[in-house]
Amino acid sequence: MASLYLIRHGQASFGSDHYDQLSPLGQRQADLSGQFFADIGLHFGQAVSGDLSRQRETGERVLKAQPRPPEQRIDPRLNEVDNEGQIAALLPMLCERDAGFAEQVKVGRHDSKQYQKVIQAVFSAWVSPDCPELPGTASWCDYLDGVKGALEDAMDCAESGSDTAIFTSGGTIASAVSWVLGVRHDQIYGFYEPVFNCSITRRNTTTACRRSTSTTWNRRSRSWTRRPRSTRLSSFRPRAARGPTPTT
């Protein structure tokens, strides 16, 4: 049975002038992930990435450890959710509800933990059925449709029995998981924040996986040798790539 492997990019350069690139730790995470796949003999028949630099660089570093690395296809539908666009559009509404929210946004520009709280509030408002139409940024429904389309196209392009590497971001993975599991909108962020850099979420390419359960969520690679028979979706990360839980 073929699978899609959704791999979050390595740590980006939070706080630098060029956020959309891997930090030294992010580069190491990607290199170790590539070595992990090589060590367990998992060879990809195709590779797809969003068009963000941190996603593409992660893919390049992972794939260089493959004996016959596939060419990386670019699909912008796998890009991260537009956090900045959502913040700009939703900030006035959220500040009306909470006078301290604007200050939290200001502090969050230089404090990754505070920024994560801003992302949580904005993301939760964005996926809510009550979210108004936002100028300049996609709606939750449109973004999710794009993610679904990208994954379905990847499945259609995969050769029989061939596994696919998909290099993407935490919000994209959370969206995919919410689609597969059919979770409520107020539960979606719970699948966003825990996604480690270079963690790996596996989706079996069968219709049944759309309503299956999530297991071994963000577990270390040692659990990979104990695959539950009923598992259709699982997430793990290479043990050696552990680092601080990042927000980038």
Give the residues covered by each predicted segment:
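Phosphate-coordination/substrate-recognition cap region in phosphate-metabolizing enzymes
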Residues: 35-120
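Active-site metal-binding loops of divalent metal-dependent hydrolases
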Residues: 10, 170-171, 216
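Beta-strand elements within well-structured catalytic alpha/beta cores of enzymes
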Residues: 3-7, 162-168
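General small-molecule cofactor/ligand-binding pocket signal
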Residues: 5, 73-75, 213
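Alpha-helix-centered segments that form part of catalytic cores
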Residues: 108-149, 153
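Short, well-ordered beta-to-alpha junction loops that form the rim of enzyme active sites
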Residues: 51-52, 77, 164-171
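Acidic, low-complexity terminal tails and accessory targeting/binding regions
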Residues: 81-105, 109, 141, 156-163, ...
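Loop-to-helix element that buttresses phosphate recognition and phosphoryl-transfer chemistry
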Residues: 3-5, 10-64, 138-146
